[in-house]
Amino acid sequence: MFTLRPNQALVADDILLDGRLALFHQSERWLAVADLHFGYELSQRAAGALVPMWGMASIRDRLLQLVEEYRPARLVILGDLVHDRTAVVEARTLLEQLRQVCEPIVVAGNHDRHVRGRIEFLDSWETDCFHFHHGHCAVEASDRIQIIGHHHPAATISDGAGLRLKCPAFVQQSGCWIMPAFSPWAGGVQWARDEESRVWLCTPERILRLPEAQPVSA
């Protein structure tokens, strides 16, 4: 029997959420991530901002670590592979590295529009039960669960004494799952919890399922 670590959670039959911001299907052997925004620091430097050159290395190392650990047949990148065209060469190099160990499936996001002629993208990808797309465009209703990115969900916990910690979150709703942003530069958008949302707060060392919002009494 598979033993879960503190940074893993079973969020559905055969599906693991990893606190390093990835989703893995154990029997179908796909690993999904979203919103890498690869090359964000290059984009900011080109615009004159003095930001450290550590984001791309962090993304690459974490991806390769996840792929080595889970051994997926396919790595599904759910849009916004790059932040803009500044890092297209570096992004292509990353994909070549990944192709040595699995099949990258790169779904197009809104930030990818300027590099679609230089990197191969899909508008969406499907399995029997899941429909993967970025989430920035409306799609036709389907009996498959949608798995999307784009929204950069985050959640906040506090100790009751004034300390508050905001972390990336994975959100499950009926018919739609929203991935946290994989980019270390993504601050995340506080997710407005409701009765329909199951929210998992993600850190590299631990995953916490937040209490579900209670219905408002009349």
Located regions from the model:
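Extended recognition/assembly regions associated with phosphoester-bond processing machinery
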Residues: 1-78, 82-218
